[in-house]
UniProtKB/Swiss-Prot annotation:
Protein name: Probable D-xylulose kinase A
Keyword terms of this UniProt record: ATP-binding, Carbohydrate metabolism, Cytoplasm, Kinase, Nucleotide-binding, Transferase, Xylose metabolism
Matching InterPro entries: ATPase_NBD, D-XK_euk, FGGY_C, FGGY_N
Gene Ontology BP, a term: D-xylose metabolic process
Catalytic function, reaction form: D-xylulose + ATP = D-xylulose 5-phosphate + ADP + H(+)
Family statement: Belongs to the FGGY kinase family.
Top-level taxon of origin: Eukaryota
Pfam family for this entry, one: FGGY_N
UniProt-annotated location(s): Cytoplasm
Predominant localisation class: cytoplasm
Length: 573
């Protein structure tokens, strides 16, 4: 009977909750259980899942909280009636960059769990350090400077590891940790990422790190497929490179590797089968691109408070402003990522200014913003001879490019490539509605243009499809402008998986790892089973001949504008 077929669990261990999502072989979701850290945990004085030490800009989570959460989610699935004996494979997604420090007795404690007690009761003593740094932590500026310098500069670090140094990345965090707590570091037997920590709990021994998530450390040389020894030496300091290598462990290349059977604790406590396999867990961003069969050169744009752009690509072209990771399942592909701080908040500022001008200051409706965006011609050009209106709108400091908060407006003439900072001809705030969406999308196109290929005869390089997720994906005007600028020969689609993308991606990864035929890629297996009509809706046209090319000219002006503003700001300091 189909109803007795195999099931697969995908976990998502994020900052504020642990989620367990169960799918069958046909990728249909049959159960979801959540454990909200603030609402459901006992004994932790956390806020939004974390603790803070503002004096040192530290943000971290108690690891014991996650132990409590895993039992909590599994209890929730049991109450929903999940038949654990049908679960054939488990994978997971973890908040990226966070590290867990295991003590000398970790393996013994993991291997000797008693099903009559909770994980928290038995494993709280398994860690040399009780906390895990969170991605919001900003305590490592000194260490980041050292990481950026050790290979010759941020460009060289990005070339080797896929990213320049970032506060949240695991390498700078480990360097600071071994300096701040040398005795604790010495007694640390192993270091896990949040993703491999989750897999370790399920396996009953320390799991290896995942081939994609390891790229979020500033330690893994992506080109060489090995840890970078110069970076390990810096990170390990007086304790030595070989000691750190042992702490980190080997990294298998196969994202679908069978790590081993589930630990006896879960068989006895919850009724899992002794044949249930544990698969590598990956990071939350890599898991997101597994929530659908994302083809090479397809793009995902997450339009939340911040903006995240994800693309699967065969090209490895790192830059200090971007991130590259190994693809979590498919050798020869990479995940390209852009992260912006100014996303939805910046658009809301313009929306509110427009509503106030039109006499409804308390309104949070997007109706006026959308209407004006669609009524305004591309780049504010009423005729071809008019200059293009370009701007940067940053209510909070930005990282791409690295600029203070502020607003800058320019007029650009593509015929003679002249760029003038000016409010002339700008009717604010109305002109800013389209200009802010264009500004955000032009930045994405500028930074991803070297990674796209032509999807067909006489069509310029661009994504095949653009998938929008997050709150902004509900906005038809944003979708239309996204298609005009980014292209998408097959159109612009809204991906509607709620906030389940990471857990779904992890569950799909488990299905693929357990049911693939030899050599079968994730994209092929999931592509055959994924019911497109249930998850996506075409919401805008993509490539439009003439309009796309016009925005290609605007990208040149946009790049000039960024350089000019950066130079002006450098001169001010």
């Amino acid at each position: 009977m189909a109803s007795q077929g195999p099931l697969y669990i995908g976990f998502d261990l994020s900052t504020q909750q642990l989620k367990g999502l169960v799918v069958n072989s046909e990728l249909k979701v049959v159960h979801i259980s959540k454990f909200d850290f603030d609402a459901d945990s006992r004994g932790f004085s956390i806020k939004k899942g974390v603790l803070t030490n503002e004096a040192e800009h530290e943000v971290f989570a108690p690891v014991a909280l996650w132990l409590q959460a895993l039992d909590g989610v599994l209890d929730g699935l049991r109450k929903q009636g999940l038949d654990f004996s049908r679960v054939r494979g488990i994978s997971g997604a973890g908040q990226q960059h966070g590290s867990v420090y295991w003590g000398e007795n970790a393996e013994k404690l993991l291997g000797g769990l008693d099903a009559g007690k909770t994980l928290e009761e038995q494993l709280s003593g398994a860690f040399s350090h009780p906390f895990s740094p969170n991605w919001q932590d900003a305590s490592t500026q000194k260490e980041c400077d050292e990481f950026d310098a050790v290979l010759g500069g941020p460009e060289q670090l990005a070339e080797a590891t896929g990213s320049k140094a970032h506060h949240r990345f695991t390498g700078p965090q480990i360097l600071r940790f071994q300096r701040k707590y040398p005795e604790v570091y010495k007694k640390t037997s192993r270091i896990s990422l949040v993703s491999s920590f989750l897999a370790s709990l399920l396996l009953g021994h320390i799991a290896p790190m995942d081939i994609s998530d390891v790229c979020g450390m500033n330690l893994w040389n992506i080109r060489k497929g090995a840890y970078d020894e110069d970076l390990l030496k810096l990170c390990a300091g007086p304790f030595g490179m070989e000691d750190l290598k042992r702490k980190l462990g080997d990294v298998p290349e196969d994202g679908g590797l069978h790590l081993g059977k589930i630990n006896k604790y879960y068989i006895d406590r919850y009724g899992f089968s002794s044949d249930c396999e544990i698969l590598p867990s990956t990071g939350d961003n890599p898991a997101t691109i597994l929530a659908l069969p994302l083809r090479p050169s397809d793009a995902m744009v997450s339009l939340g408070t911040s903006t995240t752009f994800l693309m699967s690509t065969p090209s490895y072209k790192p830059d200090p402003a971007t991130h590259f990771f190994n693809h979590p399942t498919t050798p020869g592909l990479y995940m390209f990522m852009l992260c912006y701080k100014n996303g939805g908040l910046a658009r809301e500022h313009v929306r509110d200014a427009i509503n106030e001008k039109l006499g409804s200051p308390a309104s949070q409706s997007w109706e006026n913003f959308d209407r004006i965006t669609l009524e305004t011609p591309p780049l504010g050009q009423k005729s071809e001879s008019d200059p293009m209106k370009l701007g940067l709108f940053f209510p909070r400091p930005e990282i791409v490019p690295n600029l203070r908060s502020g607003q800058w407006r320019f007029n650009y003439n593509p015929a003679n490539e002249t760029l003038t900072e000016s409010n002339d001809g700008w009717n604010n705030p109305s002109d800013e509605a389209r200009a802010i969406v264009e500004s955000q999308m032009l930045s994405l196109r500028l930074r991803s243009r070297g990674l796209t290929q032509s999807p067909g005869a006489k069509i310029p390089p661009q994504p095949r499809r653009v998938y929008l997720v997050g709150g902004g994906s509900k906005n038809k005007a944003i979708a239309k402008v996204a298609g005009e600028i980014l292209g998408g020969s097959d159109g612009v689609y809204k991906l509607d998986v709620g906030d389940n993308a990471c857990a779904l991606g992890a569950a799909y990864k488990a299905v693929w790892a357990m049911e693939r035929t030899p050599g079968q890629t994730f994209e092929d297996l999931i592509g055959q089973r994924w019911r497109e009509e249930e998850f996506i809706e075409k919401i805008a046209d993509g490539y439009q001949k003439g309009v796309f090319e016009k925005y290609g000219n605007a990208v040149e002006g946009f790049e000039k504008m960024e350089h000019q503003v950066l130079e002006q700001e450098a001169a001010r300091k």
